[in-house]
Amino acid sequence: MFDGNGVTGAVLAVGYYALFLGSGMYIGRKLLCKERYSIVMQYLVGSVAGVLALQWFPLLFAFAFNFSMTAHVLALLLQVVLCVLVGWRCHCSEFSLQQHPYRKVTEWKRLFRENPVWILMAVTFAFFCYCLYTHTIVGNADGSMHTGQSTYGDMNMHFSFITSIANQQTFPPEYSLLPGHKLSYPFLCDSVSSSLYLMGASLRLAYVLPMLGAILQVFMGFYCLIKYWFGRSVTALIAWILFFWNGGLGFVYFDNAEKVHKIFTEFYMTPTNYLDKNLRWVQVMVDMLIPQRATLFGWAILFPLLAFLFRAIAVRKKKLFVMAGVAAGALPMIHTHSFLALGMICAVWLLLDLTENSLFVTGKAAYGWKAASASRGSSRRNGKVTASGRRNGKVTSSSRRSANVSASTGNRRGSSSADATASDSWIRYALYIGLAFFSVMQMINRSNEFADKHGLVIMIIGVALFVLFLGYKLVRYLQNRSWKRLAFTWGIFLILVLIFALPQLFMWTFSQASGDNFVRSHFNWSNNGDQYIIFYLKNLGLPFVLLLLSSFMVSARNLKIGAPYLLIWFVAELAAFQPNDYDNNKLLFVGAVFICGLAADALVQIYERYGAVYWRSAIGKAGVVLLGACLLFVSAISGFLTMGREWVSDYELYTASAVKACRYIEDETTPWDVILTSTAHNSPVPTLTGRSIVCGSSSFLYYHGLNYQQNEQDVETMYTSPASAKELFREYDVNYIYLSNQEYGTYNVDVNGLYEVADVIWQKDDVSVWKVKDEIFE
């Protein structure tokens, strides 16, 4: 039942989730206790491992026992066995425990003091929780169910997956929106909720609970990645703000009270999502992480994995690459776009690792978040803090110079100075070359649509050249160094990724993505008329400006580590990977992670070079604070307005009569019955009951590459001419008919004809449920 099994069901579901999460954190702590990770990072990695186990272990047993309680009990037993084995094999020595930070309360206080991002995370997490609470089928006083603006669409699809997987228990699962078709959408983001729903949680609780853990993993994974990359809390803090509180310059189009009022009353007329003004770079929290579960759960794996892999490359330990490979291999059926983005990131990082030996080595404090008492004690000598480059509370010019030198040249060990100089030059101009290339392509495309027709070919050629260059560097590396060094790091990682990912890709992804509308030419993402640079300037806003400056403000070392965004942007701007061109933003936003990191570091460098001088006087401080406030306003105001719109949005999703009808359907029908309904995206039958329908909404099925058109036509025929469509009722094995104002408003329903094929068995207001007569199937 979508209402759940009361307190017992809720406790069982929460307990099941907590057991996997807690055991995963235990495993992470045991496996990483001897590594130079903070406990925060260890528990983050462990929580990711726990969620991966919750997503995958029931499915492994579901092949034999279907998606049943038996499969889930066996999955839990497997997790317990894994915990016992890890606890038995992995011992944390007393020395390693003593060397570890956060053993005392003072260390935790220092953690919060040196990483103020916790405050922003808490505020943003509260916003996320409130939106989920008010948007997830909230029961109204009249019995109807309500939602918000961003969740009005996709949430219905996710509900249909969650309820059908749990109720029908067939594995591999099929589309309840199009029976007979294998569910090839990355459904592990929903099966995790199906597990909790199966335990007895209400649909609302099963939907929300895993998302709360996932958003914290996204927040922490992003911050750890930037912190490891730059080794500075302030850079990670600014990057976090630029990414999660993004807004662009769309606010300039809302220049009077009437337009501002429409932000909070119209459907999708916000400063970050306004088609008429070509505003397409949506607010991350509102339009990516709240409504798009695959993106949320994909990033919950991807961001911590990137931070973890960063460290693995630096220390070159086989165990870390093994752990990273297993996690990466689990990604395709959680979020395919994240898996593709990870592949491009790893390709660039591998190239950098082959050419510059110690590029990923960062100060030890970065890995411990500057909280270890030992590292902190060593940073103070003769009354000055050398680690932060501050003397008596002031940033010294010598510390800045030494930091810049070490950042740009200290990571070139093992590579020739000529190679380093050449790579330093190209990385500083790569962004401008790319912008010039795409601007010229846009001008050519406007006259003859060359890029729209041949973008895929251009992309393939570019990627092929990159792969050839990577192969060349690989050969040179193997000629000069031991192959074992590479085989037991990147080699193991690649093998494990292929072992775990290929079965998923062949079983689910490739079969559905083989249509003509998937991998194809498409130029310039969602730009509808603006000049190339202007489009991204007004959509990205301050991060784009700072990115332009970063080429000359940021060290070459940091520019190189951030280079994956160049490859991601190149690929995503020339080809589309599914029927909805707009969905390339799921790749572009991963590229934006690196853009925000570089933009944040550029801002820090600007302050240290020019702003620190003015900080010494009261007037100077006021000026710096005012300038910082203005920059924050420009960067975030569009995002805040969009978040405010989401905060107050409220729409009826299912009427009270529809909800009551669904309760009746759950009680009186079997999970495998097929019900005839309209193809509306918010049809309550597949979402609340998990029953299969003849055809779901084209807004879902088309973008999944499914051939639904005949089913859609047959649905209309069965409503408009039921007496002459008896063969269709038999063909689709329709057991029940659902009739409401949705169906009356969509089709010219022949009610008299329906009486010839079915009988009314339930009715309330405008909603009725009909049972197809047995004689139809004779």
Where are each of the predicted segments found?
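Membrane-embedded, hydrophobic transmembrane alpha-helices
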Residues: 1-111, 367, 373-376, 399, ...
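Signature aromatic-anchored transmembrane alpha helix within multi-pass, membrane-resident enzymes
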Residues: 354, 402-403, 410, 425-439, ...
